[in-house]
Amino acid sequence: VLLGLMLVWVAQACAQDVAQVAVPDQYNVRQFGTAGDGKTDDTAAFQKALDAAGKAGGGIVYAPRGNYFFAGHLNVPNAVTLAGVWQSVPAHNGIRDRGMPKPTDDGTTFLVTEGAGSEDGPAFVTLNTDSTLKGAVLYYPQQNADDEPKPYPWAIAMRGKNPAVLAVEMLNPYNGIDAMHNERHLIRDVQGQPIRRGIMVDDIYDIGRIENVHFNPWWSNRPKLFQWQMNNGEAFIFARSDWQYVFNTFCFGYKVGYKFTKSNRGVCNGNFLGIGADDCQTALVVEDSAPFGLLITNGEFVSFHGPDPTMIEVMQSNKGSVRFVNCAYWGPCNQIARIAGTGTVGFSDCTFVQWGGKEGNRPAIQAQSGTVMIRGCEFRQDRPQIQLGKDVRRAIIAENIFAGSQRIDNQSGGNVQIGQNVADGQSSPVPSGDK
């Protein structure tokens, strides 16, 4: 009986081996000579496995539990997935918090070392058409948690069509994801503490998607490192992107949380739902935007540190349209929004909790120029609510609720409509500039 059972087991094992050979779509990096000991350079072995999968027409290159040291960089061929053990993005804040998991304690961890001292150079992982990075931790062991950061190239670059980053922890890259020059990128379930830049989007002509991304100082909040990040870091940067979709994203502790800028390729338009920025010197900056707009809904913005903590800043260079709907703004900032440019900015059904600066006399929303719409919003402090500068071309301020008295300073020479606002106290007289 025992001999019979052994023969059955051997037969099953052989059948499994035959099946693997017959369908060579999965490649274990251990079979290509990786050490996974955190010391031996595994770059060449990983690339050999990736190239084998690419030559076969695609497949999954699997990196089992281990600490894989890289002195170089990787290129993931078309239709190849580089996958670690994680099915959901993990958390490793043990370097910051004693007793919690460290990045080398478990799972699949890539120790990245190439390019220290310069942002120039290839990304650690370059994804191409239909290729994916999934289920791994990227950790830069030579970055000092107690000092100003050393520059590195991008951790991940996304190229071609439909590249994807799924369930990846970028614990402490200098630059996170370069999502430029591709079509239909997908970034989902990504967490970590990118220090200088989190995600950069540009040169996108077919819809990119970013979902469930959370940047927080889990690796280090020590004064020298974290203050540098607060003075220099930008979490999400968008330049030319047509129909960008962003959903459920959050960042903490940056100079700018969300930045919309203009590159030589153009500007961004898109749908931004459930986005958040906490303890950023400026939560959201618009340098320029498309005429068909940035549609921002259910946002949560908090600013209270820095030389002039401001939730929203729309720059003089903006010519496009920006809409904030059902957003909340709190934290002892100086101002909720400072608006310039020739574009249109609208706030609808928003809640403004704190503003005014130390003296309490700065308006929540200060528009210097352009077109402004503020409708159905709640101002929860008895402080100056709105100031319209002389270069404001058009404005509608209607159906808002004010704590205390209405304090609207209208210096505009343009067409301004103010009405149907409700205040606790007697409304202040509307200046003669109301037209």
Per-range role (PLM):
Residues 1-12:
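Bacterial N-terminal signal peptides
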Residues 28-29, 82, 418:
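Bulky hydrophobic/aromatic "packing anchor" residues in well-ordered structure
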Residues 29-64:
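Acidic Gly/Asp/Thr-rich repetitive segments characteristic of extracellular carbohydrate-active
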Residues 47-55, 68-83, 87-134, 139-162, ...:
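Extracellular beta-strand-rich solenoid/capping regions of secreted or surface-exposed proteins
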Residues 117, 135, 139-435:
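Extracellular beta-rich repeat passengers
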